[in-house]
Amino acid sequence: MTKPVARAPQRRNARSNRARILATARRELGRNPDTTLEELARAAGVVRRTLFGHFPGRAALLEALAEEASEVLRGAMAEAAEPGEPADRALAHFTLLMWPVGDRYRMLLALARHDLGVERVAEILAPARAEVTAILERGRRDGVFPDHLPPAVLSAGLEAMVVALLEQVNTGALEDDGTRAAVAILIAAGVPERHARTVVESVGPAVLARSLPAE
């Protein structure tokens, strides 16, 4: 009688291939959103059939990236500041937490309208948008932030700024671990520059130590 074929090594190999394809897709699509699946397969070091075995088409690959981004975002949000933290510190904390997530998945921003659809990206970002709006509302009540704009409107403006900064990272015009972005966000929210820098210098080291897992 023949022995059953061991499946565990095959499953591990399949998981490894899938993870490598996704990591390659993040990198290559960030460089060129028009990269083809065939080009991604070559860059990942797998044959075309292996890639299509995991992802039957471009839409399936992008949806897998979107789901991965959503999971990483939720995990990062679990490290958000405590509710009692002053709003300026909470906003700096949150910006620093989100920066590496945005940096890793910034290619989704370029693909949002054409491939994923604005609604899918909005679904992924909904928890982060709600958190920032809540911080701004609390800061306005506490007199930390001015009330020149409704919190939801200001939140949208700050998000657009982060997207613009990430695009500059994508082009190589900006190098940032999130510190400069956090200062810019606080200033845009109405915090004086000197105080914004002091807040980020205070909050930054502990938050930056919580890096995303390596690729």
Where are these regions (language model features)?
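Basic, helix-initiating cap at the start of DNA-binding domains
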Residues: 1-43, 60-63
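Short hydrophobic/aromatic patch on the recognition helix
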Residues: 45-55
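Short linear capping/connector segments at secondary-structure termini
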Residues: 110-119, 201-202
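Short hydrophobic clusters on alpha-helical segments that form packing/core surfaces
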Residues: 21-28, 51, 73, 98
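C-terminal peripheral helix-coil segments that are non-catalytic and often amphipathic
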Residues: 1-5, 134-141, 167, 171-215
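Hydrophobic alpha-helical connector segments
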Residues: 64, 71, 75-105, 117-120
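Alpha-helical DNA-contacting segments of helix-turn-helix folds
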Residues: 55, 60-69
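Amphipathic alpha-helical packing segments from all-alpha helical-bundle domains
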Residues: 68, 116-167
